[in-house]
Amino acid sequence: MNPFHDLEPGPEVPEVVYALIEIPKGSRNKYELDKKTGLIKLDRVLYSPFHYPVDYGIIPQTWYDDDDPFDIMVIMREPTYPGVLIEARPIGLFKMIDSGDKDYKVLAVPVEDPYFNDWKDISDVPKAFLDEIAHFFQRYKELQGKEIIVEGWENAEKAKQEILRAIELYKEKFKK
């Protein structure tokens, strides 16, 4: 089984999507799902002394403008592991440009954690935490000499629109 191609994007798209975790919160290791084999591989260790502030992964059967699966960040109270599948509720969209390419990311919360039951939109997330995420992405490739431009945050509705678009891009790319 290849989770990227064989899993659906989610049980109730776009309200609830699957987040296939590649990188757990707190890690400096950047793992990626190998799109061909479906295995998790070590892409690199971050050059900067930063740690991912969220669980980070992809939404299965999606494709995005950066020529990769659509990224998703899941706010977790405790980190999970590479390969874990989380039912996640999109609450916002992080907009950034990575080396000239549009590289937007969905921000979500786990459906199965009652702590986040009232988190429905980006406005429910503390500004200090949003700033921490933005700071991480603004700086995490700095020692590699790569430029990241943070464009800011959008609401849950915009995130859901982009998820639906990413599903269509996947269908076009992989003729599904």
Swiss-Prot record:
InterPro entries to which the protein is assigned, alphabetical: Pyrophosphatase, Pyrophosphatase_sf
Main EC class the enzyme belongs to: hydrolase
Primary localisation category: cytoplasm
Transmembrane helix keyword on record: no
Binding site for Mg(2+) 1: 66, 71, 103
Function: Catalyzes the hydrolysis of inorganic pyrophosphate (PPi) forming two phosphate ions.
Assembly, per entry: Homohexamer.
Stated family: Belongs to the PPase family.
Protein name, entry field: Inorganic pyrophosphatase
